[in-house]
Amino acid sequence: MIVLSLEQVLQIHALIIKTTGGSAGLRDLGRLESAIASQTQNVFGEELYPSVIDKSAAIIRGIIDDHPFVDGNERTAMLAGLTLVKLNGHHFVAQTCEIEDFAVEIATGHLDVPAISSWLHRHLTP
């Protein structure tokens, strides 16, 4: 299974800022590393998030909750999570406004990984 690296997430963030605007920059490297590590987190020797959808949800939540970037955290989180889904062979379909609204819902409602994973599953197509 493919997971995202620190370098890939930094590239995604740079792309987001370049194409949609905002202030570039990393606010806290440790928080970003923590968000990225969440996709491969183990508890008692077992993967906490075994499926690619759960890993995607974990990285989305981690970036949104930890705010490691100066700007563009929600946009970067969603693109990183959806990139992870695509890299692992899944097809995600949603309108841009749905994705934006859901990112805000995660940020304001502090949705957990299972809730984010459920939303992602509803938008997968064969």
Q: Where do the PLM segments sit?
A:
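FIC/Doc superfamily catalytic core
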Residues: 1-126
